Amino acid sequence: MDKKEKRPTVLFFDSGVGGFSVYREAKKLLPNWHYLYCFDNAGFPYSERKEESIIHRTLAACQLINQRYPLDAIVIACNTASTVVLPPLRAAFDIPIIGTVPAIKPASEITKTKHIGLLATKGTVKRHYIDELIDKFAQDCIVERLGTTKLVEIAEQKIRGHSVDLISLKDELSSWAGMADLDTLVLGCTHFPLIKDEIQLCLPQVKYFMDPSAAIAKRIKYLLDDKNLQAQNEKYNQMFCTAHFPEESQFKKALHLWGFESLEVIKID
């Protein structure tokens, strides 16, 4: 079939299920497209991995899936991975590669108190490109940084059907609880929009939550909108992971709620 006659196939990749926050915005905007989602749970969390390992695992997974489902675009729905894998992916694939960047610029434009919090993984908050974003767009703001793996784990548990541990969440955010003029929070990890309501309970002074998911969905549409969007009946949205996990059977039962037909385990060497 000619490439222009099929609906675009888009792969979302993350170390966990945080990328759901980006996928759900894309599916809301472009409901008839063909979506694949891969979470590298065998390598989770990426914030604890070396850059070389993140690059290797991301490339391997994307290339393996591309062999089976020729891709029209890849969305790295992970802030930590986006800081290191975009150049090698763009060298390996002749298709759009879309990353996620913390929404520091829009945060600096919307804050009234000029006091912003950047909530991200430990790996992301240390990256030099975060310094560059702040220097470029938020020089007139105080930008607090909090790197956390715990909140990523809490979001993972929520999406797998467990209740959110608010005590642990409050404890992790306690250093910001007394900052009365902290009015804007940058959700610098794709997991965090999944627990935004719970975060807001812990930080009631925050008025603006900056989530780039909707902007990423619009970017996908812009890059691929010249394609025919007529759905093909033989195509189903598919999910992949890289290791079996305890809640797998329960997780599979909920797949249809997110618009996926099946979950398959793929192996990355």
UniProtKB/Swiss-Prot annotation:
Cross-referenced PANTHER family: GLUTAMATE RACEMASE
Signal peptide: none
GO BP, sorted A to Z: cell wall organization; peptidoglycan biosynthetic process; regulation of cell shape
Protein name in UniProt: Glutamate racemase
Annotated family: Belongs to the aspartate/glutamate racemases family.
Catalysed transformations (reactions): L-glutamate = D-glutamate
SUPFAM superfamilies, sorted: Aspartate/glutamate racemase
Catalytic site: 78, 189
Binding annotation for substrate: 14-15, 46-47, 79-80, 190-191
Keyword Cell wall biogenesis/degradation included in the entry's annotation: yes
One Pfam family this sequence matches: Asp_Glu_race
Purpose: Provides the (R)-glutamate required for cell wall biosynthesis.
Keyword hit for Cell wall biogenesis/degradation: yes
GO MF annotation: an example: glutamate racemase activity
Organism listed in the record: Haemophilus influenzae (strain PittGG)
Pathway the protein acts in: Cell wall biogenesis; peptidoglycan biosynthesis
Gene coding for it: murI
